[in-house]
Amino acid sequence: MAELTHVDHCAFGPLYDADSEVLVLGSIPSPKSREMKFYYGHPQNRFWRVMATVLAETLPESIEEKSTMMRRHHIALWDTLSECDIVGASDASIRNPVPTDIEGLLKKTKITRIFCTGASSYKYYEKYQYPRTGIHAVKLSSTSPANCAVSFERLVSEYQQIIANNS
C-alpha cells in the first residue's frame, strides 16, 4: 500500500493580479505540478488545452506563456488546500487538509466568480472557504488524466462558463 506524503503548497503561490475577476481552483498540486512549480503540470492533464480552446488562444507551452494567457483574461489560479497528507495525486486519499486563504486573495483582486476543477476541490472550497467568502463555487469536471471518461469536448463546453460575462 502506498504511503501518505505531507504536501505543503509553499513551492508556488496563487497566480493572480489586481485585475483578476475569476478564480479557478484545484485541490492541491499533483507531484508533477510540484516538481514543475506550476499548476496542471502533468503532461496528460487537459487543463491547458481546454483553457486555450475556451479562450481562443494558441496552446501555451512555457509557464510564462500560461501565466500571461490567464492574466490577459483576468483569470486567477490557486488551490483550495495549502497542505495535506496525500498518496500520490489521489484526491480520494487526502487526510489532514488545511485550507488556503482565499478570503485574503479576494481582498486583493476583483474576483467575484469561483470555479473548482473537480469534486475534491469543490468539496474543500464549500466546506472551508465558502463560509468565509459567501461566494458559491461552480463545480467543473476535472481535467486530470484520471478523469479520462469525460471527453475533451465536454470539458470545453463546461469550462466555457469561466468566460461567460467576463470582461
What are these regions (language model features)?
Residues I28-P29, S120, S144:
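Catalytic metal-binding/acid-base residues of hydrolase active sites
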Residues S27, T80-S82, S142:
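Short loop/turn segments at strand-loop or loop-helix junctions that form parts
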Residues K32-S93:
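Short, surface-exposed acidic-centric catalytic microdomains
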Residues M1-E21, P43, G88-E103, E126-S167:
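C-terminal capping/extension of enzyme domains
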Residues E21-S27:
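Short, hydrophobic/glycine-enriched beta-strand segments
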Residues S121-Y125:
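Short, well-ordered alpha-helical microsegments
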Residues R72-S120:
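Internal catalytic-core helix/loop-beta-alpha segment
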